[in-house]
Amino acid sequence: MSVSFEKKETNRGVLTFTISQEQIKPELDRVFNSVKKTINVPGFRKGHLPRPVFNQKFGEEALYQDALNNLLPNAYEAAVKEAGIEVVAQPKIDVVSMEKGQDWTISAEVVTKPEVKLGAYKDLEVSVEVSKEVTDEDVDARIERERNNLAELVLKEGPAAEGDTVVIDFVGSVDGVEFDGGKGDNFSLGLGSGQFIPGFEDQLVGHKAGETVDVVVTFPEDYQAADLAGKEAKFVTTIHEVKEKEVPALDDELAKDIDEEVETLDELKEKYRKELAEGKEAAYKDAVESAAIDLAVENAEIVELPEEMVHEEVHRSVNEFLGNMQRQGISPDMYFQITGTTQEDLHKQHEADAEARTKTNLVIEAIAKAEGFEASAEEIEAEISSLANDYNMEADRVRQLLSEDMLKHDITIKKAVEVITSTAKVK
């Protein structure tokens, strides 16, 4: 293989390489053996067309494109490796020559990894607003949340208040005409839950069971039903029941109801204190890590970040976001309809974060390279075991999904992050 790389401008160049006849000939044979099964030529059974007849009738060149498609990925990868460049975006491929009996010459316009000039990344002084301290108020708030989860709704004779639940019938109309979706019977509505249009729940506060209330609201301008957006509506609402939460007493019995592993309220408080301490410690470490990495990135200089890198990260991020929506039962079309946005809008929303992530990744990779970090066979096996445990799959399945190069990369990145964070000092 002949390989050359000509730098055209910062982070861009043309990679030229050849595919030898030793590779081309057997691939043409494979393509022909596949193609001949699909074509009909009078006088020959399908699949039994001789090669000379094919060449005479169609020309050997008819096989070239399929053969090139099959050979190109490995040839390109080998050329990149031999040229000693790091490519960060999809190349623009061009065929220079494909002469019969000659090596094929291919050119690829490539975008290369930008130079990163590192600044300080060790012994950084950072500020974080996350506290590791667990207060009595933190513990009490956790118990109160669990206590409220065990609360029961009981009928209330007095007027409805914020936090109460009302059981209602309602009929909505605009200019005296009822509309689809504006009617409900025996609907349980938590006052203050924000389930209904802004202003609806507030107008039921202070009213008792048996009362009928004319609730007047205005639909938001961006309401999903365009025919109702921005319009004033009246909901004739009848309150059947008012219910309030009745929380259990704060005692040892409550503690046992919350957690069967404890016997007393004091034991529950101690358990929660330890759990909260672990959570706050983890949050504190994450905050220090984030602040230190941000400062290391700020101290570095990236020489002309290629827009293609950012575009690819935006594309990956948007696909991940829409995939998450899909798993929640919301298709891309449904999401864009509900939000009133477009694919282009979504890409723009992700651009800033995508650029920041791209810069961060480049700086951390540069630190790993500067430190000479590598991944040993033992570390790779440990990483495989850890991933298998985290995702509840066999180690061999992890090996199938992740190449050794990917695992090595992840391990060296973790080491670089550890260098940044372990030496950081909190002001």
Curated annotation (Swiss-Prot):
Localization = Cytoplasm
Pfam families tied to this protein: FKBP_C, Trigger_C, Trigger_N
All copies of domain PPIase FKBP-type, residue ranges: 163-248
Name the keywords, alphabetized. Cell cycle, Cell division, Chaperone, Cytoplasm, Isomerase, Rotamase
* Catalytic reactions of this protein: [protein]-peptidylproline (omega=180) = [protein]-peptidylproline (omega=0)
InterPro entries per record: PPIase_dom_sf, PPIase_FKBP_dom, Trig_fac, Trigger_fac_C, Trigger_fac_C_sf, Trigger_fac_ribosome-bd_bac, Trigger_fac_ribosome-bd_sf, Trigger_fact/SurA_dom_sf
Q: Say yes or no: keyword Disulfide bond present.
A: no
Q: What is its main location?
A: cytoplasm
For this chain, one GO molecular function annotation is:
protein folding chaperone
The family note in this entry says: Belongs to the FKBP-type PPIase family. Tig subfamily.
Protein name, per record: Trigger factor
The top of its lineage is: Bacteria, Bacillati, Bacillota, Bacilli, Lactobacillales
